[in-house]
From Swiss-Prot:
Protein name (database record): Large ribosomal subunit protein uL24
Pfam families named in the record: KOW, ribosomal_L24
Organism: Psychrobacter sp. (strain PRwf-1)
Gene Ontology CC annotation, any one: ribonucleoprotein complex
General function of this protein: One of two assembly initiator proteins, it binds directly to the 5'-end of the 23S rRNA, where it nucleates assembly of the 50S subunit. One of the proteins that surrounds the polypeptide exit tunnel on the outside of the subunit.
Keywords: Ribonucleoprotein, Ribosomal protein, RNA-binding, rRNA-binding
Gene: rplX
Transmembrane segments: none
An annotated Gene Ontology molecular function: rRNA binding
Top-rank taxon: Bacteria
A Gene Ontology BP annotation from the UniProt entry: translation
Length: 105
């Protein structure tokens, strides 16, 4: 199970886009799509049924979730996530470095 969720602010820790930050657009299994990261060129075929035009399109591609880490805005560094239960018994995501609750999008 991925600890990162759609809307989280992450930083790339490995690969060609190392050091760049972005917002998570999608999480599928062990892959993640981040806004403005891992841009690839796709040669799109025209489709009359959907009205999509053909041509060369640049879009974000999925990258492995191990290549990104959540960005802690308080420490301005990459961080990890752990889970803790609050007083009511609700499960919360917290930063490992300082124990603050991760803001949900």
């Amino acid at each position: 199970m991925a600890k990162l969720r759609k809307g989280d602010n992450v930083i790339v820790i490995a690969g060609k886009d190392k050091g760049k930050q972005g917002t998570v657009l999608a999480v599928k299994n062990d892959r993640i799509k981040v806004e403005g990261i891992n841009i690839v060129t796709k040669h799109q075929k025209p489709n009359a049924a959907t009205g999509a035009e053909g041509g060369i399109v640049k879009q974000e591609a999925f990258l492995h979730i191990s290549n990104v880490a959540i960005f802690n805005a308080q420490t301005q560094k990459a961080d990890r996530i752990t889970y803790q239960f609050d007083d009511e018994g609700n499960k919360k995501r917290v930063y490992r470095s300082n124990g603050e609750v991760v803001a949900t999008a």
